[in-house]
Amino acid sequence: VPNTSPETNVIAYRAAEQLLDARDPRGALKLLDPVITAHPENTAARLLRARAFFLAAQLRAAEQEFQLVIEREPDNAFAHFALARTLQRANRNAEAVRHFRLAAALDPRPDYLEAARFEQSP
């Protein structure tokens, strides 16, 4: 295990954000794994890792991370929305609907509301 400090963890987290923005989810995952090993309670790092798993099409791992974030922060609208997108991508639309609706209820942003409404139609 490499030596980590709060500073190196922040640098790794920020670099992982940049890699995700550059569409390099695997690179982001490599940076985030040691951060989460050192700080498993860090919800922001877990949320970023869940997004990386999603972009890497590792849907089961993404689902597990988003679920963990929701367990810790049940009012995190983005986590519900992202979990819904993950479930939708895995063709689990019935499960996705619940999380789209929760996201819209927690934060009535237009994209969340649109997704919740869209998912209600047959």
Predicted segments with their positions:
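Terminal, low-structured helical/coil segments at or just beyond the last alpha-helical repeat
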Residues: 2-5, 9, 97-122
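Structural marker of alpha-solenoid helical repeat scaffolds
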Residues: 4, 38, 72, 89, ...
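Alpha-helical segment of the N-proximal tetratricopeptide repeat
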Residues: 6-38, 55
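Start-of-helix register in tetratricopeptide repeats
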Residues: 10, 44, 61, 78, ...
